[in-house]
Regions:
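Long, low-complexity segments enriched in small/aliphatic residues
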Residues: 4-9, 165-237
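Non-catalytic alpha/beta scaffold blocks inside enzyme catalytic domains
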Residues: 1-180
Length: 237
């Protein structure tokens, strides 16, 4: 869930905005104050690895996943990484299948070694507390990305003193959207979990909206014709 809210899909921007929607792109361009956002949808995970296999994509940075396990075709993933010109693996374990293909390994902290938030399938946002320190040079994924951005000359866009500031920026991107959580502070999440939406105009003393889209008016699908699956009547039950 949480990855979709922050725009972690190839066709999305923050807070359920769509890359192909010019209004959505303009909103994020103005919010970030940076360059023009391309209207081209990015590659999905399977498309990226297919691109590596075919030589259309040269490099890949793998974060928070093991494609040898998560992708449907593990053999294709292996061939793709063998064919890649440059592979960066950001991992919590030195035993991951992807390590042997890496040109650069970035040691990442595990869930118990970092803090942040997660969103589950009922739209419930929960604060995750750090339990122990990460070993050696391992860092939280967000900190690795911020440090990389600074090396690339974008440090002024990634100047966060703590993870609460990152969360605060995210909440501002949700303002006025169907997942508005401007009424949910980082401190509040440390006290209890909250279900979105929970906008600042409608504080969530009892934990946010239990039922989303309950007005039966907004964000609903149009009625569609019901039809049997292809092949019905030939062995379908």
């Amino acid at each position: 869930m949480g990855g979709r809210e922050v725009g972690g899909l190839a066709n999305m921007l923050a807070s359920h905005r769509e890359i192909v929607n010019p209004i959505h792109r303009l909103e994020m361009e103005e919010f970030w104050g940076g360059s023009i956002i391309s209207d081209k949808i990015g590659l999905t995970a399977t498309e990226m690895f297919k691109g590596l296999e075919e030589g259309k994509l040269k490099a890949i940075w793998i974060v928070c996943t093991n494609p040898m396990v998560s992708l449907p075709d593990a053999r294709m993933a292996e061939l793709a990484m063998k064919n890649a010109k440059f592979v960066v693996v950001q991992e919590v374990s030195n035993r991951a299948d992807t390590i042997k293909f890496a040109d650069v390994v970035l040691p990442a902290a595990t869930w118990a070694e970092k803090e942040g938030t997660m969103t589950n399938a009922e739209r419930r946002i929960t604060h995750l507390s750090k339990v122990i320190d990460a070993p050696a040079q391992a860092l939280p994924d967000a900190e690795i990305i911020c440090r990389f951005a600074a090396k690339m000359g974008w440090g002024n866009k990634f100047e966060y003193n703590n993870f609460g500031e990152i969360y605060k920026e995210y909440t501002e991107t949700t303002r006025g959207t169907n997942i508005d959580v401007t009424g949910v502070s980082y401190q509040l999440l440390k006290e209890r979990s909250i279900q979105w939406p929970a906008p600042a105009a409608l504080p969530a003393p009892d934990g946010g909206a239990k039922n989303s889209f309950s007005d039966s008016d907004n964000f609903t699908f149009d009625e569609i014709e019901k039809a049997p699956p292809s092949g019905a009547g030939r062995g379908w039950t």
